[in-house]
Amino acid sequence: GVSIGQRISDLIEITKDNIRVNKDGYLMIDIVQKKTGSEVSPVIADKEIIDQVYPDLPYKISEQKFNKYMKMVCKEALIDKIVKGYKMNNKTKRKELVNLPKYEMLSSHDLRRSFATNYFDKVPTSILMNLTGHNKESTFLEYIGKSQDKDYYADAFIKAIQS
């Protein structure tokens, strides 16, 4: 998720057949996103990750079980700062604003959002949108919590020509 920016529903469907080496020698994963039908091919930047998971592909796990394990790992990693967030109250079936350790609030979707947020200032928005399957820039920017101020394009242009 955090390395390739895909939804958990797409990650759990990856098989060895999805992985290939491109013309420049980089490992790629060819994915047709379930939600949008978009075809994306993110790069696997960290070969160690693929070395660890490749032998076990396809690795079937439910989204719920993945999220449970993710919370356990984050707890072990001491990602426990108290944060405000909305959590479903199982009795009332409504979301409530609560203060909880951060690991309790995290889910697989945070990995995807972190991918987009972490690369936002390093990779052109159009490339990130392609990899995450977003069609509208306004939706993408809202997704990662960035507002598009009136100088956004001018600043991006200046940054690009100064590089």
What are these regions (language model features)?
Residues 13-52:
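Conserved tyrosine-mediated DNA breakage-rejoining catalytic core shared by Y-recombinases
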Residues 18-25, 121-143:
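Short, polar N-cap/turn motifs at the start of nucleic acid-interacting alpha helices
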Residues 56, 71-130:
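Short, basic (Lys/Arg/His-rich) helix/loop patches that form interaction surfaces
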